[in-house]
UniProtKB/Swiss-Prot annotation:
This protein's record includes keyword Kinase: no
GO cellular-component term (any): membrane
GO molecular function: potassium ion transmembrane transporter activity
All ranges on the Extracellular side of the membrane: 56-81, 189-204, 254-283, 335-354, 428-439, 486-491
Bilayer topology: Multi-pass membrane protein
Residue ranges, Cytoplasmic side: 1-34, 103-167, 226-232, 305-313, 376-406, 461-464, 513-808
Domain of life: Eukaryota
Family according to the record: Belongs to the HAK/KUP transporter (TC 2.A.72.3) family.
Protein known as: Probable potassium transporter 3
Pfam families named in the record: K_trans, K_trans_C
Amino acid sequence: MPVADCESGLSPADVTGAGAANGNPGHWRSYYRHVLLLAYQSCGVVYGDLSTSPLYVYKSTFIIGSLRRFQDEEIVFGVFSLVFWTLTLIPLLKYVFIVLAADDNGEGGTFALYSLLVRHAKFSLMPNQEAADEELTSYYRPGYAPQETPILTALRRFLENHRKSRTFLLVTVLFGASLVIGDGVLTPPMSVLSSFSGLQVHSTALTSGEVEILSCTVLVCLFMVQHWGTHRVAFLFAPVVIVWLLLLGALGVYNIVVWNPRVLRALSPYYLVRFFQHTGKDGWISLGGILLSMTGTEAMYADLGHFTAASIRVAFVGLIYPCLVLQYMGQAAFLSKSPHCDIHFVFFESIPTGIFWPVLVIATLAAIVGSQAVISATFSIVRQCTALGCFPRVKIVHTSRRIHGQIYSPEINWILMLLCIAVTMGLRDTTLIGNAYGMACAGVMLVTTLLMALVIVFVWQYSCLVAALFLVAFGVVEAVYLSAALMKVPQGGWLPLVLSLVFVAVMYVWHYGTRRKHQFDVQNKVSLRWIHALGPSLGIVRVPGIGIIYSELATGVPAIFSHFVTNLPAFHQVLVFICVKAVPVPHVRDEERHLVGRIGPREFRMYRCVVRHGYKDVLAEDTDFENDLVLRIAEFVQMEADFDQRCSISDDGVVASVEVEGRMAVVPRPSDLARTGLLMREPGEEESVVARAAAAAKPESLIHSMHTMHEAESPGFASRRRVRFEVANQHTDPRVKEELSALVEAKHAGVAYIMGHSYIKARKSSSVFKKFAVNVAYAFLRKNCRGPGLVLNIPHISLIEVGMIYYV
């Protein structure tokens, strides 16, 4: 499978490090084999879109720029020269040699660049970043040491202190993500329609309408099978694309030799200059077609996390780049000697008659593979947006148990399918779709260039001059291409702009509402002084059981707690405040994921657990969550007692109490139960009849029977692992034993989940725009997205939702 080995295989860094350390040639051979294997696999995942560009580049270039009247050998050579230098400058020089080096712990893409900037400077708009997050292993790149210069310090302060600049940065990132989603709408129609249009070369009776219906049928089938996952056929992706690329290269060589070997001269930029001298404004407008030769380039960086930079470089330099150059050169040789050919089908007309049908079949398969790669990338970008609080919650399904990155979102899938069919039937012509496609491609690359310039300054800590040179060298070229694409806004170029504006509006409104809700929680959180004044009973009735309260606060007590106890003065004997929090790193290691601490003195039995996840982590269903939580709290209690013993902290003073309640510790899942002081038994294990009878006589047996009835109808809840905890007799500290006993008793009594069901309203004094954004747009999105209880896999029978109105 294309991604299986890259996520579970040998780490290139480890191999190189080992090889460098002991000089063993075997390690280097393993490393090279690993790189070549990943390079082979990347052909099917990364380069499917880029490899299908020869189907429509020359057609779009000559039609968009009205170059048919200039179609002579020198102009054709000029078009090829533009394609060659475009492929050399942007995909090869910019992406392969520069951008791929800006990985975020091996991950790439627009959000990887933004994550790097947020971690190395305070550019985030979300106020929930804590100092403890900076202690994560993956937070800073190895060997990072801040180096401040007067210019860098001034630039950093300007961006950090001006909220509008940080908002502009976020909107830029969201715009780039929206354009990637737009690619997911435009790539399937463009690729499939272009491949099927070849049928009209040898079947003149086939009408354009029939080609469109055939293309829509294939697109519907493609989206219908998404829920099955691509892992069953993914092993065919790389062979299909490699055969297609080798075929492109061979056809290119054939056309060069047969039609016009003089096309080799067009590698010189001389023909590029002559092209603009002859064509003028028409030549500039035709850049919108040249732009299509780069479609799919961003995938090299976006899919970096599935492979390695070395493997992607090897695949591009060793196979993709030479095959594409040969194909474009061969088409130019054919065009230069065939001035009367139908430019709409130039690729298929350049194919020798004897192999036309095999090439058409492989072209169709390559188009489907390229479309699948973009669809999967769209699912991935939506997941990342959701993790960072920039997209409404949608359902994420894992289609493979072995490959973590294979995901599927039903809502996004059907939206993409409807949009793809609408584009195919609405625009109909690949030239119009190409105008839209080029706009999206140029926009994504320009966003990457802008973010990359900031990374060069703030992350790599090079001088601003180096960043300026990078920005000028690539940004100016991409801006020229974008300006040419903008000329075709009335002829299809409006589509990616409309799609991007819609998606950016959805993302920003959701992020704005989420941010204002968090600010309200921070401003209205319960004072610890109020908690202390209530005493150990908190002024309410403490009932048996564990109450798990979900909150977005990583510190303090949320207002939902005081709202609940004010209206219903009873709560569980053990309270655990849980904050599921996204941090700006791609992945958080399991042993660093949970921060555990306590709120108030020991006798209050109030704890806090912060669950941290990266923007590429998925919150999968954890059937052992409750048991893991108990074990982690027990581990924290033991760690705290050990620390107290070492530091000789007294427990009878106010100072000790304050110090205790301020502690937070990273607590991994205990591998040794003896460290927790608890014994864990499976149901029925060493359980006496007397114990079972005593348990049945307890009031919570009724609750247990209700749970059992619900489990028969809820397989997901029934899959939760049931165990019984016992306190070991090894404790010498009576406080620890008492606290663990209370924890175990509460766990056996049952667990309830409390979550806020908030209604966000704009204040009456707010502007009309803010009222519309909060009261209408955000409320609509929140009502129609998945609830947080479903996302967090909370059992419905144990969930209590507390309604609150937030005036922001």
